[in-house]
Amino acid sequence: IKDFPGQENDYIDFIRIACHPDKIKETLSIAENLYDKGYEIFVQLMDISNIDNFGYKILEKWTCKNILKSLYCADSYGIITPLDLEKTFIKLKTADYQNISFHGHNNSNLALKNSLTAIKLGAYSVDITLNGIGRGGGNLNAAELLNILNNFSAKHYNQLSEEYAEIFKE
């Protein structure tokens, strides 16, 4: 943390901190310290299918939830089912997390289905990658999600296509 000079003296605006289920408490402490230095903070809970009740209790009791721009749920091994993802979102919403996001891997070909589930549940954001490039089974292919969203009036999709229209043309 000491290597981060503070947002006013840095070119970095935000920091996304990833943590394994056994490091939640330490990660939340780091998040608080970096927030105090002026950074926007995102925390990514990796391997969400293996967060136990103790991990959820730590998340529930944390008193600084409001400092997070978003709390990411990462399906690190691409094995979570849409039903289990829904249960995870409900636990986090019940614990008063406002902006919950999703980062899916496609090992079981569920990245698209899980991302659509997260969107239905009110996800703040879902991660996509070009051609689904990513570790292991890859991540959600941007074209797959954008093709589906193109058929619906997704409120943020138009903003995305307007801002990146030239890139999409290429």
Descriptions of predicted regions:
Residues I1-E170:
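Catalytic cores and adjacent flexible loops of soluble metabolic enzymes
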